[in-house]
Each structure stands twice: as C-alpha cells, then as structure tokens.
C-alpha cells in the first residue's frame, strides 16, 4: 500500500493487519538518544500507539504485537525496543554487579529461551553509578548460566555478535532492570553506512533532527534540502528515506531482530508487516525516481566524502535517485557558486539548510568553529537576500555559544547526543539580510551644525561623490574624509555600517580645549551626515598625547601599521615564581583569568569586501585589521592566485591570504612575527569557509628575514607589505623600509618561481625604490593602479610595485 503524497511517511492506522494477536497488548520501553524524546513521541502518535514519557530517553509504550513490529520496522528515531523481564531497587553504595546477579537469579530463564539458543548481555549504566560494565554483564551471564545448569544440567552458549536471545540491562541510581531486547541491536544501524567520514552523525539522530524541523510533515513542506558540509551524507540519506517511505528496519528483517525466538512471536504476522513495508517503499521509490523529489544538494570539501555519499546511497537502495541529486566536492567558500544555478532555476523556493559542521570533533580547531558558523550564516543571508522565502536553518554545535552567531529568527535549541558527544541543534528561519551599507543608503540633505558647517558640507560632498563610485565597484569599506580641512585633522573611514574616526594629534600651537571642541563638533557632524547613533562610531588617535587629551586606547598606539610586526614586549618574570607553589598557582590562575576577560572584551565586527568577509576591531588596536588602502592590491592578488603557490610576508591578519585562497590558490603561506595576528587571520579564513587545518594553508609565526633565508620553497605570487619601521632581530635591532627593502626583496626573489610576481607595497610617504633593483629585476610601479578611488592619487597613501625575474 502506498502512502498519499500529502500524508506522513510513518505508518498509520489504515495499515493495520487483522490478526488474532491484535487484541493482546504489551507494556514495553522504547528508548532514544537524549533530546529526541519529542520526535519519537511524534512518531508513536502517528502510529496511533499509546505512550508516555517516563524519563530522559525512555518512552513507556502500550502496544499490540503488530505495533511492536511496526516500531521495529518504521521508527526512524528509536534506539531500542525493550520488553521488561525483571526489575528491582538497588543501593549504589553496595556492590552493584552482585545486585544485578541477584536480580538475574530471580528469573527462570528456561521459560524465556531454549538451551540451544544463544544469548548475549548488553547494558547501559548511569554515569553516576560506579560499576564495571563488563564485570556487571559477566555477573548477569553467570546467573543465567547457573539457572540452566541447575534445571537442565547444561549451559547455553554466548554469541556476542548475533544472539538468538539478546538481553539488555539498565542501571540508574535507584533501580536495575533486565529486558528482552526486541530490536536485537540498536535501531540506528540502518545497514547503509558502508563508507564513513570523521565524526559521523548517527542515523537516528539525523532523522530526529529532520523531524524537529518538519521535513517529515508533508512531501511538499520543503522544495529543497541543502547540506553544505554533508560528510558521508547522513542527513541527505535520511531525508530521502523519509520521502520514499522507506522502512528503516527492513535490512534487519532477515536475522537481526531480538523477537524471533520470543515465545510470543507471530512469524506470519511479521511477514505480513514486512511485505507491506516493502510494497510501500517500492511505490515511494518509483514516484521519487519519476521526478517527484525535492531538490537535494550535498557539498563537501573532501572528495572522499562525496564518494562515501554515493556508496551509502547505493547501500540504502537509492541508486535510482542518484542522477536526480546534486553531490559535489565544493568547500564552503564556494557555496555561492554552488547555489547560483539552482536559484536561477527557481528550485530553492522553500529550502531547508541542515548540516553537521566540523564542530570541533571533525575540525580539531575549536577556536575557529564560531567564525565558521558565522561565515556560513552571512553567506546564506547573501545568497537568499533577494528570495521571497528565507530558508529554514538547522546546525549542530558542540557548544551552544558557537551557534549564537547564527542569524536565526526566534532560534530554538535542542540538546542531544551524537553517540557519547553532547551536541546542540540550533534551528529556525534565517533572518533576511539587512539593508544597504552606510555609504549606499546615504542621501544628501540639509544639515545645520553650528560652528562646523564647513566640515559638514565637505563631508556630505565627499560622500555624495563616493557613493556612485562605491556602488559601481560594490565597495562598502572606504575612506570618506582625509584631513581635507586644516581645522578638522581627522581621517574618516566607513566599514559597512560603522564609522571609524582617527584623530591626528593637533600641533602644540593649538590649545587642547580648541582641539577637543573641534573634534566633538566633527563627531556631531558625522552622526548627522550618516544618521547613525553613538554606538556606530569608533574613535582613535594616531599619536600618544599627554594627560586627558588621549582619545584613543593608549595601549593600542603601538599597534599601528608602522609597528604592526614589532615583537611583543617581554614580560617581567622576575617575581613570577616567588613564594610557594600554591601562590604560584594562584598568580597563574589570575593571569589566565585576566587574559580571558581581556579577550572577552575585544569586540569583533564583520565587514565584507569583494565577496570575502573579515573581522575588524575598532576598539583594541589603533588599526582595525583591514587596511582599506590596499583594497585594489588584494583584488590583484586574488586574480593572480588561481592555481598558484602564494606567499604573504608581514601577513598581519591575513586578509590578502584570504583573497588568494578564495581566488583558487594552490597553497597559501602567511608569515608574520605576531601569533596573535595570525590567529586573527585563521579566524578570517574560517569566516570564509576555508579549512584552517588543511596543509594548503600555512600560518607561520617567525621573523621574516630568518624565515625567507631558511625556507627553500618556491612561490608563484609573493606579497610583501612591510611596516615603515619596526623593531626586529635583524638589521641593528630595527627594520627601516627605506634602508632595508633591497635586502628584503633580494631574499624574497630567491623564493620566487620563474614566471612569478612579487607585489611589494609600503606606506612610507617618501619611499624611493633602490635603483639597483630596477637593474637586477623587471620592476613596474603600480601605485596608480592600487590607490583606490577614495584616496588622493596626488598624495599616495602607499607605494606599490610589481617585481619579476628578468627573462
């Protein structure tokens, strides 16, 4: 019997088979993974089976024999179906194994199974109960064997793999219970997982989560399922099995269920249930193969994962559907490209995006999980920005705070277990992407600001002019004012929805009170021009000042680009280990807590540039993490990187490295003296769906001169963006770009492959490239190409060059 398309794909009362056994009912226990109680109850309700939640992971069920068979055949969420044999209260303070032995001895096992039947013991023990599980199972086995010895003078054999009579025991703090395991083995084993990837998702957990987001309700509830990190394809396969009305227990029907040697087993009724289930699946599969199938898209960065999906689909009996599926090796960074055609073909009207990301177990770099999740959310918002329906989004996370960055409306969180691992399923509808950035939604209006009208007029004029250029080049991070007026010596940069204001220290000839007043007037004018609140403006100073005239973060002053790669100051450890070990431990704990709190205070914002996302910090460093004057340079590097080995020296937060990776670089190596900045760079990689654990992407904390001297690799593209001045281990203890650039470039050229290119840039306004380099290499100044439309080409903020080997 086939199931109508608009009905649930679980059994219903219309499938009931008339039988003499139908009247008798049994009290059983159906278990599931923690957190899946609600989906399991939904299943049981649609089977018209009486049930009651007893405790975490346990549902008490009153069912007929036919209903028991149908639970074993059809339940996608259940773990085990257990028939109670005996139970007793226990005292966990005493020997629990011996109490279990005593409980088993109260059962006449010869009335339950025959001597020539094999048996096995499995059990679950509450973690609060101290007992050796192996020893406890051994003591239950001893009791059963002794019962047969006393009655029949012989013992039944044990078969741990495929017993005729599987016994299951449970122990909690107050009670022990012994069951006949009617399911035989855990019902999550569907039989199709012939190929696996790291940290696979359990089948019944995947099904329960699909229930949670409503995939099961009707065959028309979603138009598509998208799994951007599909692994071995568990979500995809479980979704297809639901759609095709597949009885998930059918592969166990031959020999693996635990009720075959139960005295109440009705083999004729069982065969009727099996035949009916097979017919339903056959009908469902034929309809799906004929085209009545939602759009299914699965992607993974690992080619082996996609091969595993194909193997598992074949093992699940779904080979006919493979031509109708999209299964591609694609990293998360290519999700926009992957979904472009389905969107164009209008196949993603009501999509479900559900995935099991590498939440730490698969990735191994837990610090970069949150950026990965945040980047996925931002990417989906961009992809579906112009669609009528926003997708339903469901993701697993190892820690609930990892999922907090997902842009989900009215988010729901389900705590559950994937095997022994506690995970959190965050789900809800994707929040539609917010409107345009500050620069694109700017409208020139009449604004009056007493005493600062000239500043307001100039700022409005600048923004109005830049708006058109920004729209043309799709730029949202740009400089809109650069000390244009002598009385207002500030640089104003727009980063998406935020304004970053840098005040240049006024000359000593201007009284501090006057400087402060002008600056406050400028801030007032900025708020009026952009129509923003105080929280969207961030203020910095580019030089240290005395007393209370310091507007920026004094600790950030040394973090400017001109000293970004200076070694971090050495800590004074002279008093660190004074006193006893207890005092040392306390001091170390305080230090770690202070470090944790400082890290927590750092507020990162995300901005977009040319299809890439970057973290910027407006408060803790003088520079933000993204040098907007190098926007065009990063675009050049991206264009030159396809199939190339790329080296980024003085990598800072690795923004150029991200563009190289997104541009299709074969490999990207980022070298910087600061591990903190490299970690920031790794977060930028993760934010863009780039796997920071792959050998393709290297992050090396090292002195640049030491590294390029010792390294022997060859690179096709090298980007060098050194500070103007820095303390360094080389060159008399300092680095000066004018003095030392020749030696730096010569060493870098030793690492440049034939046909490769070095992009060299620096921000020293009076910089002149050594004539010796023009003679030795093919050098082209490209400053005019790398200066953006928002900077003055007559006063270039940087100087840049292309350098190649001479032919």
Curated annotation (Swiss-Prot):
Q: What is its EC number?
A: 2.1.1.173, 2.1.1.264
* Family designation: Belongs to the methyltransferase superfamily. RlmKL family.
Main localization is: cytoplasm
Q: Which InterPro entries match?
A: 23SrRNA_methyltr_KL, DNA_methylase_N6_adenine_CS, RlmKL-like_Mtase, RlmKL-like_Mtase_CS, RlmL_1st, SAM-dep_methyl-trfase, SAM-dependent_MTases_sf, THUMP_dom
Q: Where is this region: Disordered?
A: 548-602
Keyword annotations for this protein? Answer: Cytoplasm, Methyltransferase, RNA-binding, rRNA processing, S-adenosyl-L-methionine, Transferase
- Which Gene Ontology CC terms are recorded? cytoplasm
Q: What is this protein called?
A: Ribosomal RNA large subunit methyltransferase K/L
Q: Which domain of life is it from?
A: Bacteria
Which reactions appear under catalytic activity for this entry? guanosine(2445) in 23S rRNA + S-adenosyl-L-methionine = N(2)-methylguanosine(2445) in 23S rRNA + S-adenosyl-L-homocysteine + H(+); guanosine(2069) in 23S rRNA + S-adenosyl-L-methionine = N(2)-methylguanosine(2069) in 23S rRNA + S-adenosyl-L-homocysteine + H(+)
Judged by the first EC level, this protein's enzyme class is: transferase
The answer on whether this UniProt entry bears the keyword Glycosyltransferase reads: no
Q: What is the lineage of its organism?
A: Bacteria, Pseudomonadati, Pseudomonadota, Gammaproteobacteria, Moraxellales
Comp. bias regions, Polar residues: 548-560
- State the species of origin: Psychrobacter sp. (strain PRwf-1)
Q: Where in the cell is it found?
A: Cytoplasm
- PROSITE patterns documented for this protein: THUMP, UPF0020
Q: Where is the composition biased (Basic and acidic residues)?
A: 561-575, 584-594
The molecular function terms in GO held by this entry are:
23S rRNA (guanine(2445)-N(2))-methyltransferase activity; RNA binding; rRNA (guanine-N7-)-methyltransferase activity
Locate the THUMP domain: which residues? 67-182
Q: What's the stated role of this polypeptide?
A: Specifically methylates the guanine in position 2445 (m2G2445) and the guanine in position 2069 (m7G2069) of 23S rRNA.
């Amino acid at each position: 019997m086939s199931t109508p398309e608009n009905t649930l794909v679980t059994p219903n009362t219309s499938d009931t088979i008339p039988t003499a056994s139908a009247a008798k009912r049994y009290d059983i226990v159906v278990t599931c993974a923690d957190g899946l109680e609600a989906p399991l109850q939904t299943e049981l309700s649609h089977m018209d089976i009486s049930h009651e939640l007893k405790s975490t992971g346990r549902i008490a069920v009153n069912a007929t024999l036919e209903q028991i068979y149908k639970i074993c055949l059809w339940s996608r969420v259940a773990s085990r179906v257990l028939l109670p044999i005996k139970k007793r209260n226990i005292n966990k303070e005493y020997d629990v194994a011996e109490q279990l032995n005593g409980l088993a001895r109260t059962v006449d096992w010869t009335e339950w199974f025959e001597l020539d039947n094999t048996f096995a013991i499995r059990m679950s023990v509450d973690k609060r109960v101290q007992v050796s599980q192996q020893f406890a199972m051994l003591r239950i086995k001893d009791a059963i064997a002794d019962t047969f010895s006393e009655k029949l003078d012989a013992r039944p054999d044990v078969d741990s793999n495929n017993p005729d009579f599987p016994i299951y025991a449970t122990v909690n703090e107050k009670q022990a219970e012994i069951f006949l395991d009617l399911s035989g083995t855990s019902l999550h084993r569907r039989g199709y997982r012939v190929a696996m990837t790291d940290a696979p998702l359990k089948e019944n957990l995947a099904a329960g989560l699909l229930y949670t987001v409503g995939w099961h309700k009707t065959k028309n509830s979603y138009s598509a399922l998208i799994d951007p990190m599909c692994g071995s394809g568990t979500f995809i396969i479980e979704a297809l099995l639901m759609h095709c009305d597949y009885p998930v227990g059918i592969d166990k029907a031959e020999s693996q269920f635990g009720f075959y040697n139960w005295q109440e087993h009705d083999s004729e009724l069982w065969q009727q249930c099996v035949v009916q289930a097979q017919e339903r699946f056959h009908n469902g599969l034929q309809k799906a193969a004929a085209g009545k199938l939602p759009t299914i898209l699965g992607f993974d960065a690992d080619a082996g994962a996609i091969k595993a999906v194909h193997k598992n689909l074949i093992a699940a009996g779904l080979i006919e559907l493979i031509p109708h599926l999209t299964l591609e090796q694609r990293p998360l960074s290519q999700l926009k490209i992957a979904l472009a055609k389905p969107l164009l073909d209008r196949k993603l009207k009501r999509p479900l995006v559900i995935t099991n990301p590498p939440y730490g177990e698969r990735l191994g770099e837990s610090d970069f999980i949150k950026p990965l999740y945040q980047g996925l959310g931002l990417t989906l918002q961009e992809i579906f920005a112009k669609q009528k329906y926003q997708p339903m989004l469901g993701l697993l996370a190892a820690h609930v705070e990892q999922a907090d960055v997902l842009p989900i409306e009215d988010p729901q969180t389900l705590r559950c277990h994937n095997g022994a691992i506690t995970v959190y399923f965050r789900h809800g509808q994707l929040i539609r992407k917010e409107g345009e950035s500050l620069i694109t939604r700017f409208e020139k209006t009449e604004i009056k600001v007493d005493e600062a009208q000239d500043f307001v007029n100039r700022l409005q004029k600048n923004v109005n002019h830049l708006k058109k250029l920004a729209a043309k080049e799709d730029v949202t991070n740009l400089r809109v004012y650069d000390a244009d007026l002598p009385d207002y010596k500030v640089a104003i940069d727009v980063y998406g929805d935020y304004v970053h204001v840098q005040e240049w220290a006024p000359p000593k000839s201007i009284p501090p009170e006057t400087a402060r007043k002008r600056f406050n007037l400028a801030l007032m004018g900025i708020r009026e021009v952009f129509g923003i609140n105080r929280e969207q403006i961030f203020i910095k100073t580019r030089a240290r000042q005395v007393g209370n005239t310091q507007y920026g973060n004094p600790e950030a002053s040394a973090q400017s680009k001109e000293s970004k790669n200076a070694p971090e100051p050495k800590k004074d450890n002279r008093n660190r280990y004074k006193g006893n070990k207890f005092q040392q431990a306390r001091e170390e704990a305080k230090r770690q807590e202070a470090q944790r709190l400082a890290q927590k205070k750092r507020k990162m914002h995300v901005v977009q540039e040319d299809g890439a996302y970057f973290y910027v910090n407006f408060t803790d460093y003088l520079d933000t993490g993204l040098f907007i004057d190098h926007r065009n340079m990063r675009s050049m590097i991206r264009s030159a990187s396809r199939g190339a080995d790329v080296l980024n020296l003085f990598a800072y937060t690795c923004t150029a490295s991200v563009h190289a990776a997104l541009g299709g670089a074969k490999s990207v190596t980022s070298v910087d003296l600061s591990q903190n900045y490299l970690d920031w760079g790794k977060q930028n990689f993760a934010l863009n769906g780039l796997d920071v654990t792959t050998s393709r992407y290297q992050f090396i904390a090292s002195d640049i001169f030491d590294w390029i001297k010792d390294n022997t690799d060859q690179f096709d593209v090298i980007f060098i963006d050194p500070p103007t001045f820095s303390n360094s281990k080389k060159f008399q203890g300092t680095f000066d770009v004018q003095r030392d650039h020749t030696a730096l470039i010569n060493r870098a050229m030793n690492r440049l492959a034939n046909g490769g290119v070095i992009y060299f840039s620096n921000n020293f306004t009076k910089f002149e490239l050594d004539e010796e380099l023009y003679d030795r290499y093919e050098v082209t100044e490209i400053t005019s190409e790398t200066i953006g439309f928002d900077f003055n080409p007559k006063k270039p903020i940087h100087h840049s060059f292309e350098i190649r080997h001479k032919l």
